[in-house]
Amino acid sequence: MPRKATINGIAKLEETAFELSEVVILRYGTLYGPGTWNTENGVIANQVRNNEIVATDGISSFIHVEDAARAAVLALNWPSGIVNIVDDYPATSKEWLPIYATAIGAPNPKIQTGKNSWERGASNNKARKEYGWIPLHPSWSEGFKNFMSV
């Protein structure tokens, strides 16, 4: 139920935003980097260390906070519409969670088949091809390794 309320709220927010004459809606992937839940001492890291997150077939798309901020600035000059702001590699949690766990020095996660119906990645093709946006951190796997070693 809480997820449905969140999704309904976002849908209403987007619907309301489109009442404006010009609006660009940026749909960000899961943020990582400084100041996010995914930092080495963040909420997600603690859950991974405590083995509270299970690796599944569910797909996620990530975006480094630096790329998210750059997209927001560039979007000031983009035409109205909805644009996904994600890196180049959507991944199952079976792919990203072990790499993340290693980056923070946590044990390997438990693995389970299946996924939630809402777990799916996104594409940045529109941002790249129509607006020339290119992520500075195109790969979550390199991004995880780099920002955790800072």
Q: What does each of the following model-derived ranges do?
A:
Residues 2-6, 29-36, 54-66:
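Glycine-rich "substrate-gating" loop/helix at the edge of Rossmann-like oxidoreductase active sites
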Residues 69-118, 124:
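Mid/C-terminal beta-alpha module of Rossmann-like enzyme folds, strongest
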Residues 43-83, 90:
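Alpha-helical substrate-binding/gating segment
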Residues 7-18, 70:
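Conserved active-site helix of classical SDR/Rossmann-fold NAD(P)-dependent CH-OH oxidoreductases
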Residues 34-43, 94:
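Short beta-loop-alpha junction of Rossmann-like oxidoreductase domains
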Residues 107-150:
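C-terminal amphipathic/interface module of NAD(P)-dependent oxidoreductases
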Residues 14-34:
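Conserved beta-loop-beta element that borders a ligand/cofactor-binding pocket
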Residues 8, 60-63, 91, 122, ...:
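Residue-level signal for the nucleotide or nucleotide-sugar donor/cofactor binding architecture
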